[in-house]
């Protein structure tokens, strides 16, 4: 079975690469993103819209309400193995994402060492200026999407249920928006009415939070196997 793995830090274009590859191959894309398993966080987690998918198929490891929390890495890994098994007859899958913990689970599991032909695309972290430009563009789109609720609208809706707030504080984007509101002594719903200057500061802050996370991803991702080449067989990751 062919597995095409696309991974790298946030805001480096993995989803676009996966969609383009899905168009070329006709294979479905399975998201290796634990936060994207919560549809209530669709915009803030970077779930592509139906239009952005361009007729391709995108699968998720779970479909759960936020009240259940973010799926644990070990459970997500079990779901990943099950989905790969389910699609074995289709001849292949595209795996795309940047969950450090899930990729580490893959690296530590012997399951991936046999019976697969690997095609790996590793997106690297660019310099800070290039990254921030891309991250700010992404945040602007999240704050004013063409379709669906904005990141702030998702936050405001979920904020109304106090038991969800600790979960939101653990998620990039939502966490900074909550901090920004607190620092400026406003309620989350007032984030929907910011002037251009304040919105610019919010965008910059969220992008900076993404940069911090991207640097952590770049540092903690398991390394690609030294034996990696197009269509190689064996473990996809090396020792770390």
From Swiss-Prot:
Pfam families: IPT
Record-level GO BP terms: cytokinin biosynthetic process
Keywords recorded for this protein, A-Z: Crown gall tumor, Cytokinin biosynthesis, Plasmid, Transferase
Gene3D superfamilies membership: Crystal structure of tRNA isopentenylpyrophosphate transferase (bh2366) domain, P-loop containing nucleotide triphosphate hydrolases
GO molecular function, one term: AMP dimethylallyltransferase activity
EC number: 2.5.1.27
InterPro entries membership: P-loop_NTPase, Tzs
Catalyzed reactions per annotation: dimethylallyl diphosphate + AMP = N(6)-(dimethylallyl)adenosine 5'-phosphate + diphosphate
Family: Belongs to the isopentenyl transferase family.
Function summary: Transfers dimethylallyl groups to AMP as part of the biosynthesis of cytokinin phytohormones.
Protein name: Adenylate dimethylallyltransferase
Name of the coding gene: ipt
